């Protein structure tokens, strides 16, 4: 969820967001709250410089009924929930699969307390084909882009755009024979809620710098897997921190939806 990183849907304050329904992605900036429940231990450190890149740390999903955040037991479960989040909103009862005593009456697993960087992402991202990985690399604060997405084929080949994926599939038709489709790939990235995390660029430079102009499959959306040489641990958070307008980030009560969340740390974590 942090490839949460996650699953669930929530209203966005931006009119440009698709249908106003998005996921939340969280990246650890300062450290863990010892009172929070842990799935896997995350050891965090303060950012030593603006160029230090946060790592993805954990996955969470927001209940569509009580709006509390629930930790996901694994990135795989997070991706499973995220893939059909619009059609099947997440509820606390769903978490009984891995936590039998959970309900909306149980306090949230985690709260947003200023120790993590949140970013908005979209639900219903297709899971990568079997044997493939979808990777999200977060860039350091102050850069011109928040993150990069790329895929790793079973052969180990890294693909950084839809064009590269299409060419690779054309050159390796056995994957097409196995049912791999271009619609299973997405290179959209999350959007940080911290306004100054990404350095503003002149409008005339956007088209030449931003590499998201390549065609994106309609069925695919954003977020990420962790690279074999990336580092990961798991944990979670909720959008009620001062400075955030709760009306912007509270799912509409007319239609029950959920929100997904992931967060990370600046530490080097064990390889997956």
Curated annotation (Swiss-Prot):
Domain MBD residues, every copy: 118-192
Gene3D superfamilies, per database record: 3.30.40.100, Methyl-cpg-binding Protein 2, Chain A
CW-type zinc finger segments: 53-112
Principal location listed in the UniProt entry: nucleus
Motif (MBD-associated domain (MAD)): 62-104
Keywords from the UniProt entry: DNA-binding, Metal-binding, Nucleus, Transcription, Transcription regulation, Zinc, Zinc-finger
Location in or out of the cell: Nucleus
Presence of keyword Acetylation: no
One annotated GO biological process: chromatin remodeling
Polar residues composition-biased segments: 1-15, 236-250
Tissue: Expressed in buds, flowers, stems, siliques and mature seeds.
Binding site for Zn(2+): 63, 66, 92, 104
InterPro entries: DNA-bd_dom_sf (IPR016177), Methyl_CpG_DNA-bd (IPR001739), Znf_CW (IPR011124)
Region of interest (Disordered), ranges: 1-24, 236-272
Keyword Cell inner membrane: no
Superkingdom field: Eukaryota
Oligomer and partners: Interacts (via MBD domain) with DDM1.
Entry's free-text remark on domains: The methyl-CpG-binding domain (MBD) functions both in binding to methylated DNA and in protein interactions.
Protein purpose: Probable transcriptional regulator.
Name of the featured protein: Methyl-CpG-binding domain-containing protein 2
Species for this entry: Arabidopsis thaliana
């Amino acid at each position: 969820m942090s490839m949460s990183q996650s699953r669930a849907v929530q209203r966005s304050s931006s009119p440009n967001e698709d249908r106003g329904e998005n996921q939340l992605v969280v990246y650890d900036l300062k450290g863990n709250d010892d009172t929070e429940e842990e799935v896997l231990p995350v050891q965090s450190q303060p950012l030593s410089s603006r160029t230090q890149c946060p790592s993805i740390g954990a996955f969470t999903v927001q209940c569509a009924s009580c709006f509390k955040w629930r930790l996901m037991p694994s990135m795989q479960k997070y991706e499973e929930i995220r893939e059909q989040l619009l059609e099947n909103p997440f509820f606390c009862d769903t978490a009984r699969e891995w936590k039998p005593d959970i309900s909306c009456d149980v306090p949230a697993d985690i709260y947003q307390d200023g120790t993590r960087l949140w970013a908005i992402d979209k639900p219903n991202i297709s899971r990568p084909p079997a044997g493939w990985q979808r990777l999200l690399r977060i860039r350091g604060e102050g850069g011109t882009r928040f993150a990069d997405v790329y895929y790793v084929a079973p052969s180990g080949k890294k693909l950084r755009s839809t064009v590269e994926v299409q060419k690779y599939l054309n050159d390796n038709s056995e994957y097409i024979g196995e049912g791999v489709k271009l619609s299973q790939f997405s290179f959209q990235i999350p959007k940080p809620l911290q306004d100054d995390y990404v350095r503003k660029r002149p409008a005339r430079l956007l088209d030449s710098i931003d590499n998201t102009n390549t065609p994106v499959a309609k069925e695919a959306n954003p977020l990420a897997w962790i690279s074999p040489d990336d580092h990961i641990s798991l944990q979670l958070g909720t959008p009620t921190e001062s400075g955030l307008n709760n009306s912007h980030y509270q799912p509409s009560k007319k239609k029950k939806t959920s929100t997904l969340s992931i967060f990370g740390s600046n530490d080097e974590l064990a390889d997956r």
